[in-house]
């Protein structure tokens, strides 16, 4: 007798072992048709999985997140099947599920073209309509290696050869195609109805630039056509908002091959940067942080002591001078510990909060670079809090409150918080980790926020809180972090004199709110589609004259606004006013002031707000007051 407990708490009993598909069929024909897989005691399995002992079972359908993952994984295999069917010489490698879709890497003797993608997608649709059953078999490692070598799939054979000889290998087949996979997969290809191939990109075998270059075909797959259409529409919107395009259109920044991963900021872009930096400086100053500045280049010995040289060396830029090795800092924390160590610290000095807009450099691979979002040179709104164990909960509460307030000011109201917990390989005792994790939970609870816990995702030196902001398109970006560190203070000899005159290690909290300034500006540009709120806009106002006779008045008006702290310019060119308005509208300037003879004589201005909104004619002082209210409204 096999007893199976379902999610609603009911128990079904069977006289003999049954498959997930048979359980679904016994519940009802609708569920049998909808079943894509199952969850046996929390483990995702195929519908063909045999149940021979008492378990808890959930039937997975397209309504479940796991169901969508199964569909995407199976669609990746369908892609490989179609490619092999159309281009038998192509070799298959790997094809995982990613956010919103999947990809598959191929080795082929010529580049795939857009026409090839159309042909492949059409073939996928034909194969899906055949509704071929998907079967699984388990073989030994050596048998699997021999099979893939016999059909000329050297990459698959190489993957399997790296697996321990005692491990069983799962092979999935449908039609004339067999692939290595952990599964699970849909019961038949007919379940794959909504998908689209997106693009081809380059990739390296096993992600190593020293290996052969492959071709990566990206695709997306969904359970409903309307979901896919919504996703494709979001991509169109994202394309319009691409910070690289807007950076060029709005003359904010550029990047060039002579300095890969580094940003050339133009005047308006640097003005935007300064607004963000100055805002952040005000906030951390008000929160009791002390701003410091640490060297960009430091001796190898310091990086060895911190552990970065051993664990992060390949991502560090290094140099040599007078027979000494140096590294350009990839992060600011070791330098902050040096400031803390400079002098004897007492428990009365704590907490000490050091902030730095620290310039860091990391040797990211050129293929990973992406506009402002992934760079080699960046500035962090970095800070480190040195405190006692009794203080770290209150410091965590204060940081969370500050971070959430900052995100709101920048226009991000949807923030997801994640708590990364202890990994298997870690420093410190279980008791220490218990206190650290529970302390962060207490801090988040005190702030009245909800969070998701991620077991095993913490760093080896401590648990971490992550802040993921959602932009106008619903995309999630991790920006802020609060990382408890139980290792670096010991490695670098940080200590303070406790109340009982003993020497103790401080708790060290690494924290950032916006993270990389470059990346955050990229997110801001895309979130606001380049139309920054008035307080952030690099150019808040443009004053335009209709004819030469109003040029002097327009110029004096711009100068008056500038003296009052407004970021303004006067456009006195001998162009039609409609041309000027259109040009500055495309520049997404919040306010356009137009002056003609009537405005000059009455000492007024005609005001147009962004979006073509006519606010009418008003005295300059009235406009200034309106602008001030607009600027202050973000608070």
From Swiss-Prot:
Binding site for Zn(2+): 333, 384, 510
SMART domains named in the record: tRNA_SAD
Bound cofactor: record note: Binds 1 zinc ion per subunit.
EC class: ligase
Region (Catalytic) residue spans: 242-533
Locations listed in the record: Cytoplasm
E.C. no: 6.1.1.3
Necessary cofactors: Zn(2+)
GO molecular function, one term: metal ion binding
Reaction equation(s) it catalyzes: tRNA(Thr) + L-threonine + ATP = L-threonyl-tRNA(Thr) + AMP + diphosphate + H(+)
Domain TGS: 1-61
GO cellular component, one term: cytosol
Function per UniProt: Catalyzes the attachment of threonine to tRNA(Thr) in a two-step reaction: L-threonine is first activated by ATP to form Thr-AMP and then transferred to the acceptor end of tRNA(Thr). Also edits incorrectly charged L-seryl-tRNA(Thr).
Xref: NCBIfam families: thrS (TIGR00418)
Subunit organization: Homodimer.
Family: Belongs to the class-II aminoacyl-tRNA synthetase family.
Protein known as: Threonine--tRNA ligase
Gene name of this polypeptide: thrS
